[in-house]
Amino acid sequence: MIAGSIYKLDWSQVNLRGGLVTVLVIVVVALVMALFGTLGIAVGLATLFVMIADTPGSLRSRLVAVLTFSSVGALLAFGGAWAGSERPVLASLLMAAVVYLATIAAARGKSAAVRWLLLSIWVVMVISLSSGVERPIELSLAFLGGGLLAGIGIAVRGWFADVDDEGDLLPPMSVVFAEMRTPLGRFAVVRGLAAGVATYLGVLLFPEFPVWVVIAVLIILREERGATIDIGVLRTLGTLLGVAVASGVLVILGEYGLAVIAAFLFSGFAMIALQKVNYAVFSLFLTAMLVFALHVSGEDALEGGVARLLATLLGVAIAFGGILVTTADRTSTQSS
């Protein structure tokens, strides 16, 4: 099954438009970083996340959802920024709790699942961005600012679809307690603990890139063992090839700044354009883009590439450990 996943290339899934949009977004993000720094990135991410979290419904219900989502995001931003890299235990506990709720929220419908996935990613980003701000409240206000911008955009287009929403952002506590006794609930505990461990080790071992380990765990660890193994192998292979390819390109073009920038933008384009063609190919170009970005920013690209590979391997190991625990738990439950 793994070999088939490695060699399978579904060219019908090429998304050229998505690749071009990604290049545009990369350019905009670079400009925002140059002009506004960390807080500009935080506001931009918050606006994007709130817009993605928007669901069809009456304008009033949608704006209430925006307010709720923005408030939760702001609270998580404060907690994540306060913990940051200086309090890895607290950061890991926060990450574990959010990922647990995100996994449980999947039982509440697609809307709740998407919102909590976005909040999980937001916490990861906050931990990474926290070193760029002086006070935790700054990232909280940035998320509220992004929510305000998104709310204005949603209000402007609010005359569109008017159907029922799919559920609340926060699952009722009765649902949380009920799900704890189900296979999904037990998997949510394992996934949350895995994310917490990944956050702690990421901050401890990769202080410059603490998010890479936990992101690998979030992407790789699935309820199905086969899917977890497949995606873990593909991500490892793609990351390894990405470091190798980018390092080779830098050996040849490293002295030509514009050529490296072009390679960086092309990697971003190919990453999304080929995302659904093959996950290993996606991981290859994602890693290459990150290595080129490190070179452009004046960092040691080879060292950063090796760090990403090691972080990915650690994330894969944690995810595989998580699926072993899940499988053992299900076997024990079935036996009893």
Per-region residue spans from a language model:
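Alpha-helical transmembrane segments and their membrane-interface boundaries
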Residues: 1-285, 293-336
